[in-house]
Regions:
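Membrane-proximal alpha-helical anchors
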Residues: 1-66
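Generic structural concept
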Residues: 42, 82-89, 110, 141-144
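Juxtamembrane loop-transmembrane helix junctions in multi-pass integral membrane proteins
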Residues: 2-5, 73, 77
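Membrane-interacting alpha-helical segments
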Residues: 51-74, 123-131
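An amphipathic alpha-helical interaction surface
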Residues: 93-177
Length: 177
């Protein structure tokens, strides 16, 4: 083997190693971005303002008109609604753009999203009419509809049942630890 062939071989090995390294770095970056998105999601749910707002929303009576919601919650309560719906909006956008998976959202928030939408639909409709903006809470609605579609094909199963000792998912969890 002459020196030129050896140099070409070394060059090919170096380029291949570089491509493999770059692919590994990209994969690791994507995993980190997914983890960061999930942590951000958890943090949004753990803020005192969000928790207070969600509690106020889920305590609303079903089918309450927008005026009833305003009367029950008052101006500060309406501010809390904006905070909760903005969080759902953000999660909807992140899901649509592939930054979060529907599985993660379902694990964290399926119940609160669906209950919030059920409680706030009349209020949202009124706000859209009042401000002539059908885009008000558009991603919240989109997200709630995706969650409803998901539950229409497979009913929600609590984690303590779906991942109980003896299930395949529990066994997978044990092996990942």
């Amino acid at each position: 083997m002459d020196i030129s062939t050896l140099a070409n071989l070394i060059n090919a090995v170096a380029v291949t190693a570089g491509v493999i390294f770059a692919a590994t770095q990209i994969r690791d970056y994507r995993r980190q971005r997914k983890r960061d998105s999930m942590l951000s999601l958890v943090r949004s749910f753990q803020s005192p303002t969000f928790a207070r707002g969600l509690r106020r929303v889920i305590e609303l009576p079903d089918n309450a008109s927008a005026d009833q919601v305003r009367e029950i919650l008052g101006p500060e309560g309406e501010d809390l609604i904006v905070h909760v719906t903005a969080t759902w909006e953000t999660i909807g956008v992140l899901l649509f753009h592939g930054e979060l998976t529907i599985d993660i959202i379902d694990d964290f928030f399926s119940g609160p999203i669906l209950i919030s939408w059920r409680k706030l639909l009349p209020y949202t409709t009124d706000i859209r009419q009042q401000y002539q903006r059908d885009t008000w809470s558009e991603w919240f609605q989109w997200l709630a509809e995706r969650m409803m579609e998901r539950e229409s094909t497979a009913p929600a199963v609590p984690a303590y049942i779906a991942h109980a000792r003896g299930t395949k998912s529990y066994d997978r969890w044990l092996h990942r630890r």
